[in-house]
């Protein structure tokens, strides 16, 4: 998973402010994400999408932070992100769980494909990656919906993900 930032120190503070306090900094984070993804995956994707939040969380916050990131990144590529996923279950926040197994179980069956990605190479965007289980599940759903390939990028990786060497 490509990422411009490690989720620690000032980057962590900025991302938490962005995520939970009105989306401040979306343009900056989106620009960092766009540059990183373009450098890592140049020519490897046909369209970009994002990991969606649940309808309840979107109503509570007033926005979907990862959609904001995707829109900001795509503006720099002079395109629009495509909504390909829907969160159908309002599961507990991944950050409330410990360990990859618990996080994996928490996201199984939580997402459905809602857009056409048949034969497309998809760039899947997220805000924070800890174990990669959410991205893995979303990538699985997109592949089952016909995506030719799925590559991933996030605004930040936790040190745990950085050190794991796993792929989505």
Place the predicted regions along the sequence by residue.
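Conserved PRPP/pyrophosphate-binding segment of the phosphoribosyltransferase/PRPP-pathway fold
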Residues: 1-124, 131-168
């Amino acid at each position: 998973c490509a990422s411009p930032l490690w989720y620690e120190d000032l980057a962590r503070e900025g991302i938490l402010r962005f995520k939970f306090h009105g989306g401040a900094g979306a343009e900056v984070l989106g620009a960092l994400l766009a540059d990183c993804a373009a450098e890592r995956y140049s020519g490897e994707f046909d369209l970009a999408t994002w990991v969606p939040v649940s309808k309840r969380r979107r109503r509570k916050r007033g926005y979907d932070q990862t959609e904001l990131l995707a829109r900001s990144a795509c503006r720099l590529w002079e395109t629009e992100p495509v909504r390909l996923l829907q969160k159908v279950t309002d599961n507990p926040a991944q950050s409330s769980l410990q360990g990859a197994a618990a996080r994996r179980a928490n996201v199984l069956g939580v997402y459905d494909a809602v857009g056409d990605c048949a034969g497309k190479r998809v760039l899947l965007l997220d805000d924070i990656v800890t174990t990669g289980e959410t991205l893995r599940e979303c990538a699985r759903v997109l592949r089952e919906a016909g995506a030719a390939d799925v590559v991933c990028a996030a605004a930040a990786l936790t040190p745990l993900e950085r050190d794991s060497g796993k792929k989505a």
